[in-house]
Amino acid sequence: MAELTVEVRGSNGAFYKVFIKDVHEDSLTVVFENNWQPERQVPFNEVRLPPPPDIKKEISEGDEVEVYSRANDQEPCGWWLAKVRMMKGEFYVIEYAACDATYNEIVTFERLRPVNQNKTVKKNTFFKCTVDVPEDLREACANENAHKDFKKAVGACRIFYHPETTQLMILSASEATVKRVNILSDMHLRSIRTKLMLMSRNEEATKHLECTKQLAAAFHEEFVVREDLMGLAIGTHGSNIQQARKVPGVTAIELDEDTGTFRIYGESAEAVKKARGFLEFVEDFIQVPRNLVGKVIGKNGKVIQEIVDKSGVVRVRIEGDNENKLPREDGMVPFVFVGTKESIGNVQVLLEYHIAYLKEVEQLRMERLQIDEQLRQIGMGFRPSSTRGPEKEKGYATDESTVSSVQGSRSYSGRGRGRRGPNYTSGYGTNSELSNPSETESERKDELSDWSLAGEDDRETRHQRDSRRRPGGRGRSVSGGRGRGGPRGGKSSISSVLKDPDSNPYSLLDNTESDQTADTDASESHHSTNRRRRSRRRRTDEDAVLMDGMTESDTASVNENGLGKRCD
């Protein structure tokens, strides 16, 4: 504002230093130095320009000069008109022209200057032009330092922003300034906008730098969230980030969207860790045994839904057999969970506990099945003697190598009006390999004894009948020789076992005994013989091998007991 300094004449005739604030048609708005008087408008005829700063100060006795002085202590100093009366070294005796001749004062050379020869200003002494300022630049234009280069380029005396008119005021003592302003004003506003943007970025960078320096000394954590889980981490409308920022002690949370990196700064490690718990979403899987998948899911998904609700995970997915995204163990099915780290830890605890519970229950169930199996073998595998009643039930237990499930007991009744006697049996003993595994050695001996006590005539008759019907067969003698043509049991003895492996093998003894002891007519006996003959026919290679094995077993059993020898 020193460049727009002018002098205003006061009521006492002295000229005081003022600054031009605005230019009007016939006056100037001025501001007094040190604001010793309020701002006011002064007409042109009371205003003059100050003398040039490089004026030569050659003062001698008798010259009119201007003295920088004041009339009283309440007023500032101004330039008063005076006359030099005497000089002595650097001191001058002056006489004020506006006062009585008797009022003199001794002053130094620095307070004197030659009389200002400038006239009062006129309408064309100062020129003013205006530039409209956009709304986004008004705050920036209020700073006069922003127009320093523009002021120098156009040759203006002063450039300032007028808030009432929202315009830039350019004041100058040269008319050429107005033309330059018209040329450079648009460029000046663009430069202000660019500078403003750069300054704003620099300020933000400075603040960020200061904040980073402060946070670097505090607690902070950095972690990465997968791109497909970033939406869960941010939350709806940034709800998770807002919730994390509300944690007491958290000072800042930064997110690098390009890399999915979160940076959390806080005053304590606990605050930072708590905020991290709201933002860190991960995906993890747990291996579940295949045989327990259904029980882990539960009916209508009730069990797995309860686990999800209690743990707090967002979602759960069961990987299919045709998916190979995750490492898979034999006999295991991966359950994939998505949620915060805390919720993933919760679901691991719940699921591992539930799986352990299911395994323990399964183990107890298997133990119970084994106990039940042993009870069946002990209680149902016992063979009573041949004198049991016709309505008595007979049970057996099967080996795991032959039948996969346990069959129930079956009851069979005899035929005819009576039995031939307890000593009559069929021509075949029960094969030990097909009998109940719980059968004891004593039971087998009893069976062989019954077989050996059968009538020799009856056995011989059957042997001859079978020999005539199958002359080419290898007959089996009573003494225990091996062959396919020997005496056999009834029709249902072997063929029934081959047709129905799950049937009760002890029923053969009962049926054979009943058939041979029944008091029947000749036709009924002939029909029974035909049935026994048909049962001995080989249907397949496997059937022949089975019967051969039974023959060898029966022969060996008879020879061992010494009951197979025949006395001719």
Curated annotation (Swiss-Prot):
Annotated segments matching region CC1 domain: 201-208
Comp. bias (Basic residues): 528-538
Residue segments, region Disordered: 380-568
GO biological process: animal organ development; dentate gyrus development; membraneless organelle assembly; mRNA destabilization; mRNA transport; muscle organ development; negative regulation of inflammatory response; negative regulation of long-term synaptic potentiation
Region RNA-binding RGG-box, annotated ranges: 471-486
Chain positions of cross-link Glycyl lysine isopeptide (Lys-Gly) (interchain with G-Cter in SUMO2): K56
Phosphotyrosine modified-residue sites: Y68
GO MF: molecular condensate scaffold activity; mRNA 3'-UTR AU-rich region binding; mRNA 3'-UTR binding; mRNA binding; protein heterodimerization activity; protein homodimerization activity; ribonucleoprotein complex binding; RNA binding
Modified residues annotated as N-acetylalanine in this record: A2
UniProt xrefs under Gene3D superfamilies: 2.30.30.140, K Homology domain, type 1 (3.30.1370.10)
Domain KH: 218-279, 281-351
Any single GO CC term annotated in Swiss-Prot or TrEMBL for this entry: nuclear envelope
Keyword terms, alphabetized: Acetylation, Cell projection, Cytoplasm, Developmental protein, Differentiation, Isopeptide bond, Methylation, Myogenesis, Nucleus, Phosphoprotein, Repeat, RNA-binding, Spermatogenesis, Synapse, Ubl conjugation
Processing after translation: Phosphorylation at Ser-449 by PAK1 promotes its relocalization to stress granules and activity. Phosphorylated by MAPK1/ERK2, promoting subsequent phosphorylation by GSK3B. Phosphorylated by GSK3B, promoting ubiquitination and degradation by the proteasome.
Comp. bias (Polar residues): 423-439
Residue numbers bearing the Omega-N-methylarginine modification: R476, R482, R484
Bias type Gly residues, positions: 474-489
Xref: InterPro entries: Agenet-like_dom (IPR008395), FMR1 (IPR040148), FMR1-like_C_core (IPR022034), FMRP_KH0 (IPR040472), FXR1_C1 (IPR032172), KH_dom (IPR004087), KH_dom_type_1 (IPR004088), KH_dom_type_1_sf (IPR036612)
Annotated Acidic residues bias: 512-522
Subunit description: Homodimer (via CC domains); homodiremization is required for FXR1-network nucleation. Interacts with FMR1. Interacts with FRX2. Interacts with TDRD3. Interacts with HABP4. Interacts with CYFIP2 but not with CYFIP1. Interacts with EIF4G3; promoting translation of target mRNAs. Interacts with ELAVL1. Interacts with CEP63; inhibiting 'Lys-63'-linked ubiquitination. Interacts with PKP3; the interaction facilitates the binding of PKP3 to PKP2 mRNA. Interacts with PKP1; the interaction may facilitate the binding of PKP1 to PKP2, PKP3 and DSP mRNA.
Other remarks in the entry: This protein corresponds to isoform B in mouse and isoform 2 in human.
Family classification: Belongs to the FMR1 family.
Protein name (database record): RNA-binding protein FXR1
Record gene name: Fxr1
